[in-house]
């Protein structure tokens, strides 16, 4: 009984790897977001699509947040692809645009890190 309780507490204590990413996106915080980037990150943004180092990715996201600050950022769905891959589909709404955002994570050294962020504009 004690072992089951201990395992349950361990599972409950584990943070969802998307929590700091969601907080960073909601707060337009490129620095915090980049702390979840893998060594390289693929960013597919409206004006810019490429693979960047984590530090370059931070600058790209900082510019994006400045141009398109979020009015809201909402997670629509999260899921597990396999034991080392997770995804989230989100809505990113600005004052005059709405994007569907797909975030892909991959487990590296016991931590889930961002492999790719893709923004697709939703047509109204």
Name each model feature, range by range:
Residues 14-29:
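Short, aromatic-enriched amphipathic alpha-helices that serve as compact interaction elements
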Residues 59-97:
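Surface-exposed, charged secondary-structure patches
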Residues 37-39, 47, 77-79, 91-94, ...:
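A mature extracytoplasmic/lumenal domain signature
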Residues 32-34:
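Solenoid-repeat scaffolds in large eukaryotic assemblies
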Residues 10, 70, 112-115:
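Hydrophobic, well-ordered secondary-structure segments
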């Amino acid at each position: 009984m004690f072992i089951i309780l201990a395992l349950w507490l361990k599972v409950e204590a584990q943070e969802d790897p998307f929590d700091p990413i969601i907080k960073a996106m909601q707060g337009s915080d490129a620095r915090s977001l980049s702390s979840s980037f893998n060594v390289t990150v693929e960013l597919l943004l409206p004006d810019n699509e490429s693979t960047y180092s984590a530090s370059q990715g931070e600058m790209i996201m900082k510019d994006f947040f400045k141009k398109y600050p979020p009015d809201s950022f909402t997670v629509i769905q999260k899921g597990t692809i396999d034991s080392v891959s997770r995804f989230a589909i989100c809505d990113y709404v600005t004052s005059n645009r709405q994007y569907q955002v797909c975030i892909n994570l991959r487990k590296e050294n016991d931590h889930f890190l961002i492999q790719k962020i893709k923004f697709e504009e939703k047509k109204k």
